[in-house]
């Protein structure tokens, strides 16, 4: 490897803007600020709210069934 061409790889503190949690990692940046971390993300905390897509799926199936029924009736 060539000398003096690589950036400094140091220990930095990652800070969450949402909950204020901070932890250390290594990076070429001086500090890292994230919007959401694993400490406050709904997927990791178990507070995940599922969006009700069942209505949309049922509506699609109903339209698809209507289209198939009309095309099979015309054949």
UniProtKB/Swiss-Prot annotation:
InterPro entries: Ribosomal_bL28/bL31-like_sf (IPR034704), Ribosomal_bL31 (IPR002150), Ribosomal_bL31_A (IPR027491), Ribosomal_bL31_sf (IPR042105)
Single GO biological process annotation from the record: translation
Record has Ribonucleoprotein as a keyword: yes
Signal peptide segment: none
SUPFAM superfamilies: L28p-like (SSF143800)
Keyword line: Ribonucleoprotein, Ribosomal protein, RNA-binding, rRNA-binding
Pfam families per record: Ribosomal_L31 (PF01197)
PROSITE patterns found in the cross-reference section: RIBOSOMAL_L31 (PS01143)
UniProt keyword Nucleotide-binding, yes or no: no
GO molecular function: rRNA binding; structural constituent of ribosome
Gene Ontology terms: cellular component: ribonucleoprotein complex; ribosome
HAMAP family tied to this protein: Ribosomal_bL31_1
Purpose of the protein: Binds the 23S rRNA.
Entry's family note: Belongs to the bacterial ribosomal protein bL31 family. Type A subfamily.
Name of the protein in its database record: Large ribosomal subunit protein bL31
Organism for this UniProt entry: Chlorobium phaeobacteroides (strain BS1)
Upper lineage: Bacteria, Pseudomonadati, Chlorobiota, Chlorobiia, Chlorobiales
Gene (UniProt): rpmE
């Amino acid at each position: 490897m060539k000398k003096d061409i690589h950036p400094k790889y140091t220990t930095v503190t990652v800070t969450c803007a949402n909950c204020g949690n901070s932890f250390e990692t290594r990076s070429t940046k001086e500090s890292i600020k994230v919007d959401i971390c694993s400490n406050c993300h709904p997927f990791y905390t178990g507070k995940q709210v599922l969006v009700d897509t069942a209505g949309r799926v049922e509506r699609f199936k109903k339209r698809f069934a209507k289209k198939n029924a009309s095309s099979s009736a015309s054949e």
